[in-house]
Design a protein with these regions (language model features):
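Generic short beta-strand segments
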Residues: 1-2, 84
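A short gly/proline-enriched turn/hairpin at secondary-structure junctions
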Residues: 3-7, 33-34
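Mid-to-C-terminal secondary-structure elements
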Residues: 11-37, 46-171
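Glycine-rich loop motifs involved in handling phospho/adenylate chemistry
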Residues: 37-43, 183
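Short, flexible hinge/linker loops that cap or flank conserved catalytic cores
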Residues: 41-42, 64, 175-176
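Hydrophobic alpha-helical transmembrane segments of multi-pass inner-membrane transport and secretion
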Residues: 169-191
Length: 191
């Protein structure tokens, strides 16, 4: 995504999210608000939420940024909020921290048939992972019926966010844990 219009053009990392995303993540904006349900409707989502880092570096942390129109990919969008500095998603992903968030519904048809969307949700208290898996399997089945040419046999896999985030590095973490344990054992036996 390219920010133009005020100052030098900037290439930014943007993430498209559904309106309830920030509520699900349990975070409120530091300035302004998050997306409304109306803005999460195709054709009505010409709004953006900025990261704290972008707000400070490009807009000098001015509270007047809310309501301002900026240009993203040469299209006018209105800034509605700024997230707090502590908010990053995915957590611990410092190398790819988003600069801004846009409503996904504004461009939802573009994602039909693509299989790279990452869906995050919060399981209600008392609901097991198996129940959540069963519910979402029903949703996936309904989507496969609605889009028969695009389902490609893909399904839904419910996993805790933490487990998903450490999946790629888990073997290395376990090896490191074992090595530290061995060093501790050697250190204790030499006392």
């Amino acid at each position: 995504i390219h920010l133009t219009g005020s100052g030098e053009p900037m290439a930014l990392l943007g993430v498209r999210v559904a309106a309830p995303f920030f509520e699900v993540m349990g975070v409120a904006p530091a300035v302004g608000r998050t997306f409304s349900a109306e803005e999460d409707t195709a054709g009505r989502g010409a709004v953006v939420i900025l990261s704290d880092r972008l707000w400070r570096s490009r807009f000098a942390a001015g509270a007047d940024v809310v309501g301002r129109t900026v240009r993203l990919n040469n299209q006018p969008v209105q800034v509605v909020g700024v997230m707090p500095p502590s908010f990053t998603f995915p957590p611990g992903n410092a190398g790819a921290t988003p600069d801004l968030w846009l409503p996904i519904a504004d461009n939802i048809e573009r994602y039909v048939g693509r299989h790279y969307l990452f869906v995050v949700g919060r399981v209600k208290p008392g609901v097991t992972m198996a129940q959540a898996q069963a519910d979402l399997t029903g949703v996936a089945t309904a989507l496969a019926v609605r889009y028969p040419n695009d389902s490609g046999g893909h399904g839904v896999h419910v996993v805790p966010l933490h487990a998903h985030m450490v999946k790629a590095v888990r073997p290395s973490l376990m090896l490191l844990l074992g090595a530290v344990g061995c060093l501790l054992l050697i250190g204790c036996s030499n006392v």
